[in-house]
Each structure stands twice: as structure tokens, then as C-alpha cells.
Amino acid sequence: MKAMILAAGKGTRVRPITYTTPKPMIPILQKPVMEFLVELLRKHGFDQIMVNVSHLADEIENYFRDGQRFGVQLSYSFEGSIQDGKLLGKALGSAGGMKKIQDFYPFFDDTFVVLCGDALIDLDLTAAVQQHKEKGALATIVMKSVPRDAVSSYGVVVTDEKGRVKAFQEKPSVDEALSTSINTGIYIFEPEIFQHIPSGCEFDLGGDLFPKLVEMGAPFYGITMDFEWVDIGKVPDYWQAVRGVLSG
């Protein structure tokens, strides 16, 4: 099975760490966070993994190479340009990066999973994909329920009684939140999703594609699952991830 890891961001919220280290390479006890994701994907049968890279792309590619030593096949899609022999990164947005890959070579030919490269998770991906297929979904967001007093730190997903996504709220106040289900940056798609992503421009999953799917009334679902998830996008979250690994 095939998957994609989003690894092109600059990691501005974790500076100064990311001035010299791309976010997916931030170490959790001397092991890059992306390595945990590769191991999770392999465990659930995802052995062909595409990684979009941009900021400090060489750091990621030189460490993981073709993925053979991790038991998977890794390929890379660079976003940016080459000037005077140097790579200059310019990310295309999460959906734009996916589309660039598919336009160049139709890599995604069946149900596939997309993970953000800066989170530590222990999700049962097999069960998540099964739910996606049972719903006949074009796109699925894996959600996690959080206490109501924590919603203002996350992107909230609003669904109907059948799980169909109806709206999003970005870090709403406790009083304004219409849901306690949050977007974990874990997505499942069918290849037909590329019909709704334009080519050659910056296009984001959360900011562009998902609102478009809601407006269209597409079979776009959210599934709430119980799993450990730590986004290392902020320094306090990074230390939480380290403590989590130490405690097993």
C-alpha cells in the first residue's frame, strides 16, 4: 500500500531548532520523529512511501535514502528550485505537493494515507482505512476527541450524525466550539481526490481543498479514534513527545 508524509514545511513555530534541522528530523531520544512514522506505516503494510521535501531537504533524504534499511521504499518530491547548484525550497502547500507528484507520475493509484511529518502517533491505520472504505469516502480526516477546555489550541472538525464533515473552526473559544473533535493531520484519500486539486499552484488541504469538498457535498468524513497523538509543532509539545517516549 502507498502513503505520503508531508515534510516540506519550515517549522517556524519550533524555531530556533528548525533553523538547522527540518521538523521531521527533530530527534526524539536520538531518533527523528519521521522515523517513528515510517515504522508505523510499515507495521500496517504501507511499504511505498512518498515524501515531499523543501526546507533542508538534503537532511531528510541523506538520512532515510531509499528506505531499504527501514523495510520500505521511499521516494522524494522536491518543492522549490535549483540556483547556482543549490536547492532553494518553496513549498506548494500540502495539497499542491500531492498534486505535483501525481502530475509527474501517477503514484497514487489506490486508497492512500497522508501523514504530517511532525507528529508522534500510535494510530491503528488498518482500522482507520477500513472505516474510510466502509463509508465509501472520497476523503477522511482522522479525528481525536479532546476536553472542551482544550479546543482553543486546535483546529476543530464539525460533523453530522453520520460523520460527514460539515464545517471547520480554527482554534475556537470554549464557548464558540461546535465540537470537541480535532484534526490530527492524518488523512485517507481515494485517487479521485486529484480531480479537485489544481495543478501548478500553491494549494492547501485545510485551507483550500477541504472547504471545497464541504461546499460540493462530497463524501468527506471524519472518524474519531482513540490513540496517542503529539504534535511537535510547538516547543512544549516537543517536550511532551520526549516524555511520552520515555514513559513507553
Spans of model-derived segments:
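A short, conserved acidic/glycine-rich loop-to-beta-strand motif
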Residues: K135-S145
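Conserved N-terminal catalytic core of the sugar/cofactor nucleotidyltransferase
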Residues: K2-I5, R13, P27-L115, L125-A127, ...
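Conserved catalytic-core motifs of eukaryotic protein kinase domains, centered on the activation segment
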Residues: P16-Y19
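Catalytic-core segments of class I nucleotidyltransferases/pyrophosphorylases
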Residues: T111-V113, L120, T126-K133, V146-D149, ...
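A structural signal for short hydrophobic beta-strand segments in well-ordered beta-sheet cores
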Residues: M25, V156-T159, G222
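Active-site metal-binding loops of divalent metal-dependent hydrolases
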Residues: K10, G117-A119
